[in-house]
C-alpha cells in the first residue's frame, strides 16, 4: 500500500470496500494487540479439520475452493466473530485475523485473477494456510481508517498529501472481488448466479459509470490539501475521458509522470501502449468559497466559474 511509505506520519485511509478497510485497520491502526495471541490462534486454525457444513460450504464448495477448504474458511470466519463478540480479541486482533484469512483465500482461489468466474473441472491442489501478518510496530497513534464513500469523506478532512486511486474503467471492484467482500463482512447474504455473487448495489461506484467525470470534479473541488497525487491507468485509449489534468488544474499546478504498465487481461482484449500515470497537483493555498445560487435556471454560469474567476478583481472579498 502507498500508505506504507509514510508509516511514521499520521495516515488517514479510506475505502468503500470493507475487505480493504479491514486490511487497513490491520496494517495501520495504532490499537495495541497481542502478537502471541494472534500467532496462537492462527496456529490453531491451520491445524483444523472441519467436517460440518456452514455458510461457505453450502454456497461455494467446489467453485473457488474445495469443499474442505470452504468448510474451514466458514468455520474460521465465524470463530473470529465469536471471539470478538465474547471480548477474547480486540478490534485490531480481529482485523489481523480476517486479513490473514482473506490473504490465504486469495492465494489459493481457483480464479483467473478475480472472482467473476472460476475454472471448472480442475483439481484443487492448493489448500488454505494462514500466515501471521507483520504490521510495522511503531505506527502513528493518530492514524484513522474509514470505510466510506470518498466523495462524502473528502470535505471532512485536511491533509498535507492526499493520494487518490479511483477505478479507471467500467469494471466495478465489488464485482471482481465480491467473495472476499462477502467473507470480510460476514453478513451471510443470499448469493446467486454461476459466480455466486451477493447483492452489491450499495457498493457500486460512480467512477465506473458515465457519472465518473462529475464525481471526480466534485471530489477534487472538495479536497483540502497541499498536494493531490492521483494514480490513473490510461488503458491505452479506453476509458480515459475524465480530463484528469484539466480538472486538477482548477486546484493548482499539475505535473504528470508516466510509466509503461502491463494490464491484467482475461484474454478477451489486447490492450497496447498501456501506462500508469501519476498526476501531482500542487494546490493553491488560497481557498475560494463559491456558493451556487439557489435559483437553478437554464442560463446559470456556475460551471463556468473556473474560467471566469481569474478575471475578477483581485481585491474583491465578496462578489454577489
What are these regions (language model features)?
Residues 1-5, 13-18, 102, 155-176, ...:
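Conserved proline-anchored active-site loop of SAM-dependent methyltransferases
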Residues 1-3, 30, 266-269, 283-320:
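S-adenosyl-L-methionine
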Residues 241-242, 246-287:
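Class I S-adenosyl-L-methionine
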Residues 205-255, 259:
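Conserved Class I SAM-dependent methyltransferase catalytic core
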Residues 10, 227, 318:
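Residues at the starts of beta-strands that form the adenosine-phosphate
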Residues 10-12, 16-137, 174-209, 214:
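Class I S-adenosyl-L-methionine-dependent methyltransferase module
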Residues 147-152:
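Conserved SAM/SAH-binding loop
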Amino acid at each position: 500500500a502507498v500508505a506504507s511509505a509514510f508509516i511514521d506520519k499520521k495516515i488517514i485511509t479510506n475505502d468503500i470496500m470493507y475487505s480493504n478497510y479491514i486490511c487497513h485497520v490491520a496494517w495501520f491502526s495504532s490499537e495495541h494487540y497481542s502478537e502471541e495471541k494472534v500467532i496462537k490462534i492462527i496456529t490453531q486454525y491451520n491445524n483444523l479439520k472441519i467436517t460440518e457444513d456452514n455458510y461457505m460450504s453450502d454456497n461455494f464448495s467446489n467453485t473457488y475452493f474445495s469443499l474442505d477448504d470452504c468448510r474451514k474458511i466458514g468455520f474460521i470466519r465465524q470463530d473470529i466473530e465469536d471471539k470478538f463478540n465474547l471480548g477474547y480479541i480486540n478490534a485490531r486482533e480481529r482485523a489481523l485475523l480476517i486479513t490473514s484469512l482473506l490473504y490465504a483465500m486469495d492465494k489459493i482461489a481457483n480464479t483467473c485473477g478475480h472472482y467473476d468466474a472460476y475454472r471448472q473441472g480442475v483439481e484443487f491442489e492448493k489448500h488454505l494456510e494462514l500466515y501471521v501478518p507483520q504490521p510495522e510496530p511503531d505506527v502513528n497513534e493518530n492514524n484513522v481508517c474509514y470505510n466510506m464513500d470518498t466523495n462524502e469523506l473528502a470535505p471532512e478532512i485536511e491533509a498535507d498529501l492526499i493520494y487518490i486511486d479511483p477505478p479507471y474503467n467500467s469494471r466495478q471492484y465489488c464485482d471482481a472481488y465480491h467473495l472476499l467482500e462477502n467473507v470480510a463482512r460476514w453478513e451471510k447474504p443470499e448469493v446467486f448466479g454461476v459466480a455466486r455473487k451477493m447483492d452489491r448495489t450499495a457498493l457500486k461506484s460512480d467512477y465506473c459509470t458515465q457519472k465518473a467525470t462529475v464525481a471526480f470534479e466534485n471530489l477534487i473541488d472538495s479536497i483540502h490539501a497541499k498536494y493531490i497525487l492521483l494514480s490513473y491507468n490510461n488503458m491505452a485509449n479506453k476509458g480515459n475521458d475524465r480530463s484528469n489534468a484539466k480538472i486538477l488544474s482548477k486546484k493548482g499546478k499539475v505535473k504528470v509522470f508516466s510509466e509503461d504498465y502491463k494490464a491484467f487481461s482475461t484474454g478477451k482484449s489486447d490492450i497496447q501502449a498501456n501506462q500508469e500515470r501519476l498526476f501531482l497537483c500542487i494546490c493553491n493555498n488560497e481557498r475560494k468559497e463559491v456558493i451556487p445560487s439557489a435559483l437553478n435556471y437554464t442560463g446559470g454560469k456556475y460551471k463556468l466559474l473556473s474560467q471566469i474567476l481569474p478575471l475578477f478583481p483581485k481585491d474583491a472579498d465578496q462578489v454577489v
